């Protein structure tokens, strides 16, 4: 299976270990960054993971930032993504089996790497269980999506990157 994997600068080391875990399980990893500890902005990498999944380049996605909240909010803004921020197995399985989630998000400073890898493995191996109720719920969620043509612009985040470069954001 192809898994898109992205993170911010706070948890690059965690992402690399998750990547190694996924590869050891025979999965192909599409690493969309970030690749080092240079300060960056998490929405960029949430967006990249979401785009890989929605385009079909990846089967599923994994997003990690310090708490998981920011990157998971960002990836959920990509039309077609259904991502769940999880800290436990039950939530991850519910997201996949009932809501057909295609991305899973984690707080790398909140959850341990071993548990994270166990949850990712279970999420990948779980199957969506379509029911009429689930289908209707997913349709209602999808109806909430609105497309914003500006998101396709590769310079969409330039304003924020320039602020990072000027030191206007702090960890």
From Swiss-Prot:
Pathway assignment: Carbohydrate metabolism; D-galactose 6-phosphate degradation; D-tagatose 6-phosphate from D-galactose 6-phosphate: step 1/1
Enzyme Commission identifier(s): 5.3.1.26
Enzyme class: isomerase
Catalyzed reactions per annotation: aldehydo-D-galactose 6-phosphate = keto-D-tagatose 6-phosphate
Any Pfam family the entry gives: LacAB_rpiB
Molecular functions (GO terms): galactose-6-phosphate isomerase activity; ribose-5-phosphate isomerase activity
Superkingdom classification of source: Bacteria
Keyword terms of this UniProt record: Isomerase, Lactose metabolism
BP GO annotations: D-allose catabolic process; galactose catabolic process; lactose catabolic process via tagatose-6-phosphate; pentose-phosphate shunt, non-oxidative branch
Subunit structure, interactors included: Heteromultimeric protein consisting of LacA and LacB.
Similarity annotation: Belongs to the LacAB/RpiB family.
Listed name of the protein: Galactose-6-phosphate isomerase subunit LacB
């Amino acid at each position: 299976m192809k898994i898109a994997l992205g993170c911010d600068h706070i948890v690059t080391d965690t992402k690399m270990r998750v990547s190694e875990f996924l590869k050891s399980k025979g999965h192909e990893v599409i690493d969309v960054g970030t690749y080092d500890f240079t300060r960056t902005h998490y929405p960029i990498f949430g967006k990249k993971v979401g785009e890989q999944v929605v385009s079909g380049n990846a089967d599923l996605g994994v997003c990690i930032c310090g708490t998981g909240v920011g990157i998971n909010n960002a990836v959920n803004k990509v039309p077609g993504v259904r991502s769940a921020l999880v800290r436990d197995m039950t939530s991850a399985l519910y997201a996949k089996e009932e809501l057909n989630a295609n991305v899973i998000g984690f707080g790398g400073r909140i959850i341990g790497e071993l548990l994270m890898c166990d949850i990712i493995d279970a999420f990948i191996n779980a199957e969506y269980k379509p029911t009429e109720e689930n289908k209707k719920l997913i349709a209602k969620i999808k109806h909430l999506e609105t497309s914003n043509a500006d998101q396709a612009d590769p310079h969409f985040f330039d304003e924020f990157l320039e602020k990072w470069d000027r030191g206007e954001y702090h960890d």
